[in-house]
Regions:
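Catalytic alpha/beta core domains of metabolic enzymes, predominantly
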Residues: 113-239
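Conserved, mostly hydrophobic/aromatic
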Residues: 37, 44, 55, 112, ...
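Active-site mouth loops of central-metabolism enzymes
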Residues: 17-38, 89-97, 146-151, 172, ...
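Alpha-helix-loop-beta-strand connector modules within alpha/beta enzyme cores
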Residues: 15, 63-87, 160, 164, ...
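Active-site beta->alpha loop and helix N-cap motifs at the rims of alpha/beta catalytic domains
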Residues: 64, 70-151
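N-terminal small/glycine-rich loop or linker at the start of catalytic domains
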Residues: 3-29, 131-137
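Glycine-rich, proline-tolerant flexible connector loops at the mouths of alpha/beta enzymes
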Residues: 25, 50-72, 202-207
Length: 239
């Protein structure tokens, strides 16, 4: 006879509708245009996604972190669903922190993602699976990650917090390794972030922690120890 899980509760499903990692040649189903992002966002909400994690793209699929890029789809998504809108401040590793933060600062969403530490960000292994690309930028985007550090310094994180917290925006703290959890604890100790802490543990991206079950348990144990009952834990497996 099984014992009921005393910690069971409602589960929050987040849909990252288009992201910034994958490129158009990888799937004809990747939303690129504003209309595609709108349609897929509303469909995700209808299917049960309580949070819509939103990025924007240029017409050729390149990541677009301009406020104007988000303006093309945000109003209709907000009007069409009551799901929580989460605007990325991660954007793309190739962008400055000011560029990455601009949409969240402009539109003041309920939720914004916030990467909690610098890291190598290896996308180039995907070149082993894809050899033909529709756009020239795609191969360079992936190949360039061999020599790419995704910068999220303490100063960068402070910039995002200082820019957005006063607008009422809460954060999804993107943590790609246990060091990122300790960085979050550091900001909590300084009073720059407040509980509860919505932690997104990201597994399987080259440069961060792996995706073995032991890795997952290690991240969860560390987060539990650091944040206790103030933790709201979420899991993302890199595709």
């Amino acid at each position: 006879m099984s014992t009921p899980n005393q910690h069971a509760g409602k589960v929050i499903i987040t849909c990252a509708v288009t992201g910034a990692i994958h490129t158009p040649s990888m799937s004809p189903h990747l939303p690129v245009t504003p209309e595609e992002i709108i349609v897929d966002s509303l469909a995700a909400a209808e299917a049960g996604a309580a949070i819509l994690h939103l990025h924007a793209r240029h017409p050729d699929g390149r990541p677009d972190q301009s406020p104007e890029g988000f303006a093309a789809f945000l109003p209709r998504i907000k009007q069409g669903t009551d799901s929580v809108v989460n605007i990325t401040t991660g954007g793309s590793p190739y962008m400055s922190v000011a560029e990455r933060t601009a949409p969240a600062a402009t539109y003041q969403p309920e939720l914004a993602s916030l990467n909690m530490g610098s890291m190598n960000f290896g996308l180039y292994p995907m070149l082993n699976r894809y050899t033909e690309f529709t756009y020239d930028w795609e191969r360079a985007h992936l190949e360039g990650s061999r020599d790419l550090v995704f910068r999220n310094s303490f100063k960068d994180i402070e910039y995002v917090l200082e820019t957005c917290y006063g607008n009422g925006t809460r954060f999804e703290f993107e943590s790609y390794d246990t060091s990122h959890l300790y960085n979050l604890a550091h900001f909590a100790d300084r009073g720059l972030v407040k509980a509860p802490f919505f932690v997104q543990s990201v597994f399987g991206l080259l440069g961060g922690i792996g995706s073995h079950p032991e890795d997952v348990m290690h991240m969860k144990r560390t987060a539990d120890r650091l944040f206790g009952s103030d933790l709201r834990w979420s899991v993302l497996g890199a595709g």
